[in-house]
């Protein structure tokens, strides 16, 4: 079956067309300063590991070469081992699999073969098929896969591949789309997936970020999803002024009243943000900084870790072939997760103190970590963590566009097939899957959707999380990072989810407040 595609026409005045979805109001309040903001998909690193529809073996993953040409042994997590690692499997076994809920995934460009790639992924791992996949005959009651395309006005025009702007990053966005769709689906296999795409590259005129926010507003206004995940971002300082950033928040302000949870990847540069033009030679903000939309207090920011469990089964801590950061020399207590240095985190320079977070920030300050970046009482991220390290990455099947460009030199990553992928882009969609499960469980018992979860997260028992106490998120030697510590910290948030405990407790809190 062909994937259903809806098209959202972004014009100030647009008639309702049969067979297409239109939006009659242009994005309101988009500042000119936002037009130059460079946002990237938050895929940190990837390695091609095989072209066969059959998933690669762990030996193939260990021999993988990264996109930059470096041999980096890595472990490849599959859906079952990831579900076991974060105690999601028992929920799925009880029928709590996101049924009846819809996850909206926001991405640039999209990927034309995603319906086929998703089918390969589901066949390979025995995951529930979605109605809308290629090469699949829908069955009654199947969850769905649909695409909502935001059509820009004027339409996006692809630049020459060597113009230096980086607008040709279709390959990286293709991997991003495959990662987001396949892994939100892997966590909540019976949730509907709505892929929302814009035709805009990172800095295409006045489109870019405003198009993304307009798409999210449409999803919320038309009740198309109960959870939104976004795996892109830009440093707060790249917006030129706080006002130009604040004018983009309309969707986030509408989400709580609609009962919609909004999540975002916290970033892959630790405390260093380099989302500035020109893309090929970006500057670095010369002090610790955080990225938006993750820094928005109305968004749940998801940071990154090294997952130290066995990648084949996920049933125990890996003592045979763990990545270096999980080995005894660095992780003597055998912790479940340790900090991935790329985990975006720190304190906002735009958003002030959040009452629901102030106690956690004070507790972290009291740990008196030496060598830290400056502390603050402002909004801090991430809120929570999840596996994101490329050396403990997830398997993604992606058919890459046959074009040359910034991320396609020497055929990398233009090959189509299996990749092992890392970055907080892997973290946010999987948390979205968890929220879809929570929404199913709650509404199925007469409760409400989780909606705005940030205040609730900070009230949950610490036992609902795998606490991350080792490592820091410094990636640039000239920009200090933050050390992990017991409880919340600006590297991994409250920790990673022990889903079988966390989700029932989150449901109970949300429905009692």
Predicted regions and their residues:
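Active-site-proximal alpha-helical segments within enzyme catalytic domains
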Residues: 426-439
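Substrate-binding/charge-relay-adjacent region of secreted/lumenal peptidase catalytic domains
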Residues: 33-301, 348-422, 428, 443-445, ...
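An often Trp-containing, charged/polar helix-loop segment at the C-terminal end
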Residues: 368, 438-490
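Polar, glycine-rich mid-to-C-terminal structural blocks
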Residues: 297, 301-353
């Amino acid at each position: 079956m062909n994937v259903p595609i809806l098209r959202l026409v972004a014009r100030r005045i647009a008639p309702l067309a049969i067979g297409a979805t239109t939006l009659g109001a242009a994005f309101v309040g988009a500042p000119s300063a936002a037009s130059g903001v460079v946002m990237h998909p938050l895929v940190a690193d990837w390695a091609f590991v095989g072209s066969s529809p059959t998933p690669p073996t762990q030996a193939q993953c260990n021999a993988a070469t990264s996109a930059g040409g470096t041999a980096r042994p890595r472990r490849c997590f599959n859906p079952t081992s990831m579900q076991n690692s974060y105690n999601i499997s028992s929920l799925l076994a009880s029928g709590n699999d996101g049924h009846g809920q819809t996850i909206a995934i926001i991405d640039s460009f999209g990927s034309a073969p995603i319906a086929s790639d998703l089918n390969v992924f589901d066949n390979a791992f025995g995951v529930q098929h979605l109605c809308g996949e290629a090469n699949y005959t829908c069955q009654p009651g199947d969850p769905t896969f649909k695409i909502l395309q935001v059509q820009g006005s004027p339409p996006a025009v692809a630049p020459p591949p060597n113009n230096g702007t980086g607008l040709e990053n279709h390959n990286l966005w293709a991997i991003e789309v495959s990662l987001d769709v396949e892994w939100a689906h892997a966590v909540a296999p019976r949730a509907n997936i709505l892929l929302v795409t814009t035709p805009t590259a990172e800095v295409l005129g006045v489109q870019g970020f405003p198009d993304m926010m307009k798409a999210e507003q449409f999803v919320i206004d038309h009740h198309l999803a109960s959870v939104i995940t976004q795996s892109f971002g830009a440093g707060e300082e790249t917006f030129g002024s706080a006002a130009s950033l604040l004018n983009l928040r309309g969707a986030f302000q509408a989400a709580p009243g609609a009962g919609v949870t909004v999540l975002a990847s916290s970033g892959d540069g630790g405390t260093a943000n380099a989302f500035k033009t020109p893309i090929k030679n970006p500057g670095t903000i010369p002090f610790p900084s955080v990225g938006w939309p993750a820094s928005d207090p109305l968004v749940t920011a998801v940071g990154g870790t090294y997952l130290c469990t066995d990648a084949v089964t996920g049933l125990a801590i890996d003592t045979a072939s763990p990545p270096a950061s999980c080995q005894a020399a660095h992780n003597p207590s055998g912790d479940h997760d340790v900090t991935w240095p790329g985990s975006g985190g720190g304190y906002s320079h735009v958003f002030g103190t959040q009452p629901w977070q102030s106690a956690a920030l004070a507790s972290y300050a009291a740990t008196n970590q030496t060598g830290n970046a400056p502390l603050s009482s402002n909004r801090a991220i991430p809120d929570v963590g999840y596996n994101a390290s490329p050396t403990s990455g997830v398997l993604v099947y992606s058919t890459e566009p046959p074009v040359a460009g910034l991320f396609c030199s020497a055929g990398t990553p233009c090959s189509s097939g299996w990749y092992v992928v890392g970055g907080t882009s892997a973290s946010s969609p999987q948390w979205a899957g968890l929220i879809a499960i929570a929404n199913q469980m709650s509404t199925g018992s007469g409760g409400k959707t989780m909606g705005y979860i940030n205040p609730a997260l900070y009230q949950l028992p610490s036992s609902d999380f795998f606490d991350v106490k080792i490592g820091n998120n410094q990636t640039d030697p000239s920009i200090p990072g933050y050390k992990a510590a017991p409880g919340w910290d600006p590297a991994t948030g409250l920790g990673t989810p022990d889903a079988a405990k966390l989700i029932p407790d989150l449901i109970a809190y949300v429905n009692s407040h």
